[in-house]
Amino acid sequence: MPSCLDSWAVLAWLDGEEPAAAQVESVIGGERPLMSWVNLVEVHYRVARDHGAAEADRVLAELRRAVAEQLPGVAAMREVATIKAEHPIALADCFAVATASAGMATLLTGDPEIVERAGELPCEVSDLRPRR
Protein backbone atom coordinates (compact mmCIF):
# COMPACT_ATOMS: atom_id res chain seq x y z
CA MET A 1 0.00 0.00 0.00
CA PRO A 2 1.35 3.47 -0.82
CA SER A 3 2.12 5.99 1.90
CA CYS A 4 1.01 9.57 2.48
CA LEU A 5 2.83 12.07 4.69
CA ASP A 6 1.30 14.87 6.68
CA SER A 7 3.14 17.87 8.06
CA TRP A 8 3.54 16.23 11.50
CA ALA A 9 5.51 13.37 9.93
CA VAL A 10 7.72 15.65 7.84
CA LEU A 11 8.45 18.03 10.72
CA ALA A 12 9.36 15.06 12.95
CA TRP A 13 11.67 13.81 10.18
CA LEU A 14 13.31 17.21 9.83
CA ASP A 15 13.78 17.45 13.61
CA GLY A 16 15.18 13.91 13.87
CA GLU A 17 12.42 12.84 16.27
CA GLU A 18 12.46 9.07 16.62
CA PRO A 19 10.94 6.71 15.75
CA ALA A 20 9.12 8.94 13.24
CA ALA A 21 12.27 10.24 11.53
CA ALA A 22 13.55 6.76 10.70
CA GLN A 23 10.15 5.62 9.44
CA VAL A 24 9.73 8.67 7.20
CA GLU A 25 13.30 8.31 5.91
CA SER A 26 12.61 4.66 5.08
CA VAL A 27 9.45 5.54 3.16
CA ILE A 28 11.08 8.39 1.26
CA GLY A 29 14.03 6.16 0.41
CA GLY A 30 11.81 3.46 -1.04
CA GLU A 31 8.96 5.27 -2.74
CA ARG A 32 7.57 8.72 -3.46
CA PRO A 33 4.89 9.08 -0.80
CA LEU A 34 1.87 11.25 -1.47
CA MET A 35 1.63 14.68 0.14
CA SER A 36 -0.98 17.39 -0.26
CA TRP A 37 0.18 20.84 -1.31
CA VAL A 38 -1.67 22.17 1.73
CA ASN A 39 0.60 20.10 3.98
CA LEU A 40 3.67 21.24 2.02
CA VAL A 41 2.60 24.84 2.69
CA GLU A 42 2.23 24.01 6.38
CA VAL A 43 5.78 22.60 6.51
CA HIS A 44 7.13 25.61 4.61
CA TYR A 45 5.65 28.22 6.93
CA ARG A 46 6.68 26.33 10.07
CA VAL A 47 10.28 25.99 8.85
CA ALA A 48 10.30 29.66 7.73
CA ARG A 49 9.05 30.78 11.13
CA ASP A 50 11.66 28.74 13.00
CA HIS A 51 14.66 28.85 10.63
CA GLY A 52 14.05 31.55 8.01
CA ALA A 53 12.79 31.74 4.45
CA ALA A 54 15.96 30.41 2.82
CA GLU A 55 15.85 27.21 4.87
CA ALA A 56 12.12 26.84 4.19
CA ASP A 57 12.76 27.12 0.45
CA ARG A 58 15.57 24.54 0.66
CA VAL A 59 13.32 22.11 2.55
CA LEU A 60 10.48 22.64 0.07
CA ALA A 61 12.79 21.91 -2.87
CA GLU A 62 14.01 18.72 -1.14
CA LEU A 63 10.45 17.61 -0.41
CA ARG A 64 9.31 18.26 -3.98
CA ARG A 65 11.97 15.79 -5.17
CA ALA A 66 11.01 13.22 -2.51
CA VAL A 67 7.20 13.22 -2.53
CA ALA A 68 4.41 12.95 -5.08
CA GLU A 69 2.73 16.33 -4.64
CA GLN A 70 -1.05 16.32 -4.78
CA LEU A 71 -2.81 19.54 -5.76
CA PRO A 72 -6.39 19.28 -4.49
CA GLY A 73 -9.12 19.41 -7.12
CA VAL A 74 -12.89 19.72 -6.75
CA ALA A 75 -13.40 16.09 -5.66
CA ALA A 76 -10.69 16.46 -3.02
CA MET A 77 -12.24 19.68 -1.76
CA ARG A 78 -15.57 17.91 -1.30
CA GLU A 79 -13.87 15.06 0.55
CA VAL A 80 -12.02 17.55 2.77
CA ALA A 81 -15.27 19.37 3.54
CA THR A 82 -16.99 16.09 4.47
CA ILE A 83 -14.11 15.07 6.75
CA LYS A 84 -14.05 18.51 8.40
CA ALA A 85 -17.83 18.47 8.91
CA GLU A 86 -17.73 15.03 10.54
CA HIS A 87 -14.53 15.25 12.61
CA PRO A 88 -13.07 17.92 14.91
CA ILE A 89 -9.64 18.02 13.27
CA ALA A 90 -7.64 20.87 11.73
CA LEU A 91 -8.34 21.76 8.11
CA ALA A 92 -4.79 20.94 6.97
CA ASP A 93 -5.15 17.53 8.64
CA CYS A 94 -8.35 16.98 6.65
CA PHE A 95 -6.33 17.54 3.46
CA ALA A 96 -3.84 14.89 4.57
CA VAL A 97 -6.63 12.41 5.31
CA ALA A 98 -8.38 13.13 1.99
CA THR A 99 -5.10 12.78 0.06
CA ALA A 100 -4.39 9.42 1.69
CA SER A 101 -7.95 8.25 1.06
CA ALA A 102 -7.93 9.26 -2.61
CA GLY A 103 -4.57 7.57 -3.14
CA MET A 104 -5.59 4.44 -1.22
CA ALA A 105 -2.54 5.14 0.95
CA THR A 106 -1.65 4.78 4.60
CA LEU A 107 -1.34 8.17 6.30
CA LEU A 108 1.88 8.38 8.31
CA THR A 109 1.44 10.77 11.24
CA GLY A 110 1.74 11.22 14.94
CA ASP A 111 -0.80 14.01 15.12
CA PRO A 112 -3.11 13.17 18.04
CA GLU A 113 -6.14 14.69 16.27
CA ILE A 114 -5.75 12.11 13.52
CA VAL A 115 -4.36 9.14 15.45
CA GLU A 116 -7.12 9.26 18.08
CA ARG A 117 -9.78 9.08 15.34
CA ALA A 118 -8.01 6.56 13.10
CA GLY A 119 -10.88 4.07 13.10
CA GLU A 120 -13.38 6.75 12.06
CA LEU A 121 -11.43 8.19 9.12
CA PRO A 122 -11.59 7.06 5.46
CA CYS A 123 -7.93 5.99 5.31
CA GLU A 124 -5.51 3.78 7.17
CA VAL A 125 -3.39 5.62 9.73
CA SER A 126 0.06 4.63 10.97
CA ASP A 127 1.00 6.19 14.32
CA LEU A 128 4.61 7.40 14.21
CA ARG A 129 4.78 8.40 17.87
CA PRO A 130 7.05 6.51 20.27
CA ARG A 131 5.42 3.50 21.92
CA ARG A 132 4.76 3.91 25.61
PLM regions: where:
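Alpha-helix capping/helix-boundary segments
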Residues: 9-10, 39, 76, 96, ...
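Acidic, PIN/NYN-like endoribonuclease modules and their adjacent C-terminal/linker elements
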Residues: 66, 97-132
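Short beta-strand scaffold positions
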Residues: 5, 35, 71, 91-94, ...
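Short, well-structured N-terminal submotif of metal-dependent ribonuclease cores
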Residues: 1-35, 48-58, 132
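Active-site-proximal, substrate-binding regions of enzyme catalytic domains
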Residues: 40-68
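Phosphate- and divalent-cation-binding pockets in alpha/beta enzyme and binding domains
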Residues: 42, 79, 116-117
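Acidic catalytic patch
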Residues: 64-86
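Conserved SAM-binding loop
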Residues: 13, 69, 107
